[in-house]
C-alpha cells in the first residue's frame, strides 16, 4: 500500500502523480501545455499534491475541500476556463486511507477500535484536464457552490452526518 515509497504520504503523492500523468496522456498533452494545476488532498499543507506537481514547472493552486476537493477543483477550473483566465488546466485530488487515519483519527499502529460511525477514506486519486477547446464530448455546463450548514453534530468520527445537511441543502 506504499507503492514502493517510504511513507503513506509519499505513496499518496505517487498516486496523484500517476493520475495526472494518465489524464495528460489520454489528452495527448504534456505538463507544459497547462496554464495551471488545481490539486488537493487531505494532508497538511496539501503536501501530497505539492509533491506530485512540484516538478511540473506550471503554476499550482492547492485545494483543500476534504471530500469535495475534486468537485471544488473542477468547479473552480471550469470558472477559470470560462472566464478566459486559463486556456487549459488540470484538476486533481487524492487520498490515502493510512495517511488519513494518521492525521484525522488514530495512527494504525495505535490499534484503537473504530467507532461504528467512523468513515473509511479511499486510497485513490483522480485527475481531469479542462480546456476551452478539446476532443472530448465530456464538458462542464454548470457549477453550483454550496454553503455550510451546521446542525450541531457532536460525533467527531461521523463526518457523513456532519456533511449531509449541506449536501441536502445544496442539492
Q: What does each model-found stretch correspond to?
A:
Residues 64-91, 130, 165:
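Active-site-proximal alpha-helical scaffold in enzymes
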Residues 49-59, 81-82, 104-113:
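A glycine- and small-aliphatic-rich helix-loop capping segment at beta-alpha/alpha-beta transitions
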Residues 44-49, 70, 98-101:
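Short active-site-adjacent helix-start/loop capping segments
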Residues 1-9, 107-169:
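Condensing-enzyme catalytic core mediating Claisen C-C bond formation in acyl metabolism
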Residues 31-35, 56-58, 83-88, 116, ...:
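Short coil/turn connectors at secondary-structure junctions
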Residues 10-12, 59-71, 118-120:
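Active-site nucleophile and cofactor-binding loops and adjacent substrate-binding regions
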Residues 1-38, 42-49, 55, 149-151, ...:
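Conserved active-site "lid/cap" helical segment
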Residues 39-40, 89-95:
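Short beta-strand segments
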Amino acid at each position: 500500500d506504499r507503492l514502493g515509497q517510504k511513507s503513506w504520504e509519499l505513496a499518496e503523492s505517487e498516486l496523484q502523480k500517476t493520475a495526472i500523468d494518465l489524464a495528460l496522456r489520454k489528452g495527448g498533452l504534456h505538463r507544459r501545455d497547462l496554464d495551471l494545476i488545481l490539486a488537493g488532498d487531505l494532508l497538511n499543507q496539501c503536501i501530497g499534491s505539492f509533491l506530485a506537481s512540484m516538478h511540473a514547472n506550471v503554476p499550482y493552486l492547492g485545494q483543500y475541500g476534504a471530500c469535495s476537493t475534486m468537485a471544488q477543483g473542477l468547479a473552480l477550473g471550469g470558472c477559470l476556463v470560462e472566464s478566459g483566465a486559463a486556456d487549459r488546466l488540470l484538476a486533481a485530488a487524492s487520498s490515502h486511507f493510512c495517511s488519513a487515519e494518521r492525521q484525522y483519527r488514530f495512527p494504525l499502529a495505535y490499534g484503537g477500535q473504530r467507532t461504528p460511525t467512523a468513515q473509511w477514506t479511499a486510497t485513490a486519486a483522480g485527475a481531469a484536464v479542462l480546456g476551452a477547446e478539446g476532443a472530448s464530448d465530456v464538458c462542464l455546463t454548470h457549477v453550483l457552490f454550496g454553503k455550510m450548514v451546521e446542525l450541531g453534530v457532536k460525533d467527531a468520527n461521523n463526518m457523513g452526518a456532519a456533511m449531509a445537511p449541506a449536501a441536502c441543502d445544496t442539492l
